Amino acid sequence: VGLVGHWDVVAFDEVGGMKVTDPDAIQIMKDYMANGRFSRGITQVHADASLVFIGNLNQPHEALVANAGTDLFQPLAKEFDLAVIDRFHFYLPGWEIPKNSKSILTDHYGFVTDYAAEAFRALRKQNRFDALEGQFRLGSHVEGRDANGIKRTVSGLLKLLFPHGEQTKDELRMCLELAMEGRRRVK
């Protein structure tokens, strides 16, 4: 089954320097990202691990954003074509996240990471799509992978920010707006 069958999340770090040596690997990844399954010989393998791609930009983000001829995915290998990128649900810009520093660390009690990991694992089994659909409707122009990416991102944000399952309409709107912004960055 590989990594996607054994883990909840498979992260690829430094994807900007990633070399694709097997041309079939990208097609397998596309199928998995679209359907949650891939073929291994004559067997269909189902898995539900999330894929995370982490990397750096090769130039300042201000230059990329200001130039209409560039995009945020330029550092990816050419094999990561539009069909692969369109399967990404969300683009989280690292430049908007504060860098680790002593000022954000504590010398008081903190979360035990294995406990947090188990809590997140339990939350993966929950579906929070109903919270969104009960309060908001995506426009008719939002369909297919766009709608799926937005709904899945909202569901994930609700689990992280409101694990108890209760949020106000304004809090839900905040998650929806963030999900739409992250999906627009993919496009």
Feature names for model-found ranges:
Residues H89-K187:
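Conserved NTP phosphate-binding and transfer environment spanning the P-loop NTPase/kinase superfamily
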Residues I26, A66-T70, L105-Y109:
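Short secondary-structure boundary/capping segments
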Residues S39, F53-N56:
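A conserved active-site cap/scaffold subdomain adjacent to cofactor or substrate pockets
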Residues V65-K99:
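A short helix-turn-beta junction within AAA+ P-loop NTPase domains corresponding to the substrate/partner-engaging
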Residues L3, T21, A25, F80-V84, ...:
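Helical mechanochemical/support elements of P-loop NTPase systems and associated helical scaffolds
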Residues L3-V15, R87-P98:
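P-loop NTPase motor core
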Residues V1, A34-A49, V65, L72-F80:
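Conserved Walker
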Residues H6-Y32, H46-A49, N56-N67, A83-V84:
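Conserved AAA+/SF3 P-loop NTPase catalytic/coupling segment centered on the Walker-B
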